Design a protein with these regions (language model features):
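N-terminal glycine-rich FAD/FM-binding segment characteristic of electron-transfer flavoproteins
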Residues: 1-144
Length: 144
């Protein structure tokens, strides 16, 4: 099975902590956010249970590549970055369509998302991707 975990850089308080660590020389730019790290870890647990591959995917500007690399460092098998300036200005429904297209392109069986900035608890983007693919959406799962 192929599990795709979507990642992005840390935001809000996580950025403040990441900036402090970067100034101390402990991490570089594009730090993986804690929620997305949990999404990658969930995908890794699924891979351990069912076999297959974990792909860390980002739909973001190139500076997010650091987050993709961190996802690989914690156990993702490979990473993919889809960077296009037109996507940066897209609304959440369009981003959901892009996520669905990327999931299809990668041959994903399951997509794992963390909350998306500007999204109401992440449900708009996830639901849009699920609707395009005809997949069920399980928002805010507490365990797998």
């Amino acid at each position: 099975m192929r599990f795709v975990a979507f990642v992005k850089t840390a935001t809000g308080a996580a950025i403040d902590a990441a900036d402090a660590l970067a100034r101390a020389g402990r991490i570089g730019p594009g730090t993986l956010g804690p929620v997305d790290a949990r999404a990658v870890e969930a995908a890794i647990r699924l891979r351990e249970a069912f076999g297959g591959e974990v792909v860390a995917a980002a739909i973001a500007p190139p500076d997010v590549m650091g987050a993709v690399r961190e996802a690989i460092a914690i156990g993702a098998d490979r990473g993919v970055l889809l960077a296009d300036p037109q996507i940066d200005t897209a609304d959440l429904i369009e981003r959901g369509r892009v996520a669905a297209a990327l999931l299809t392109h990668l041959g994903a069986d399951i997509g794992v998302f963390g909350p998306w900035p500007g999204d109401v608890d992440g449900t708009i983007l996830w639901s849009a991707a699920g609707a395009v693919l005809g997949w069920p959406v399980l928002p805010q799962a507490r365990s797998l």
